[in-house]
Amino acid sequence: MRILAVDDDPYILELLPMIALKAGFSKVSTAPSGAAALDILKNSEIPFECLLLDINMPEMDGIELCTHIRAIPSYRKTPIVMLTAMKEREYIDRAFEAGATDYASKPFDIVELRTRLRLANELMVARKSNLHTSSESLPQSPSVGSGTPSPLSEAVMIEGIKNLVDERALENYLKQLSRAGLGGSHIFAVKIHQIEAIHARASVAEFSYALTEVIDAISNALGTTSYLMSYVGHGAYIVVSNGPRFESSEEMEANIQTILDEKNSEYDNGDPLDIEVSAGNPLQPNTSVALLIQETFERAIARAEARVEEKKNGPRPINIHSAYGVPK
């Protein structure tokens, strides 16, 4: 795995190749600034496969650098590990929103950093073996592109959408919040009804368009709330929100649905693309180990799926007073 490490501290730039070598990675290049890193990436004939970025650098910090790197097509999915002594939620949120894959704290825990590098290598290998055309670009309308969508189970990654990350990055985000002692997040899932029928009928572009419409509706419903979101396949989205906790998802669900209904989405031929969604009640994440984070994601999806089944048996009224924090 070819690694580029970026830090304005010469000592760190000497240390990182030694740590990487202990983890089995000998191909490490270094850059002393964001500008120098971008020059190296631009002029490198062989793409780097992992990037280590210090957040606290002068002129161009690591978060801004991460944003610039993600704008380079060949680096949209490259694992990016942020390096920093900063543990405030603001920096963690901004780093993952900019496209970070993982986060390592300074002063370095050597074992932890080796683990981060090995996980980045696993992710890089997995992505290389699962390349597919449906995630190469972001369709802007259902009239662009054709063909058959990827399998319904596939966690299609739609590029270029703010706060949308892959599931691995979402897991790492929650783990970093836990390591920094920052609580207060809650998780809920949104599920598209009859996703099998939409998937069976839609082209690649139409299916991506449908997924994007829901992402946009969720984002608008959340408003100014800080959040990260991941599409995990089968028409399900996981949302990690740092806003005020709500006991019931009914009002959130109604807001998302209203936004979708106002879009009047269509297939290529002008037929209506009717999208109905259900949202599960939120829950607190258990971030002690990765397995428990996965279990939390599964529980969130199960709640959304249970809501889908509940609505099949008839609507229930929205209780606005209980939707935001009044104990049941």
State the predicted function of each range.
Residues E122-S178:
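CheY-like receiver
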Residues D7, D54, T84:
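Active-site residues of response regulator receiver
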Residues M57-M60:
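Receiver (REC) domain active-site loop signature in two-component systems and cognate sites
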Residues I215-R245, S265-D268:
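Conserved helix-loop-beta segment at the catalytic/binding core of cyclic-nucleotide signaling proteins
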Residues P10-T30:
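Two-component/phosphorelay signaling modules centered on CheY-like receiver
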Residues A180-A200, G235:
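Catalytic-site or vestigial catalytic-site microsegments of nucleotide-handling domains
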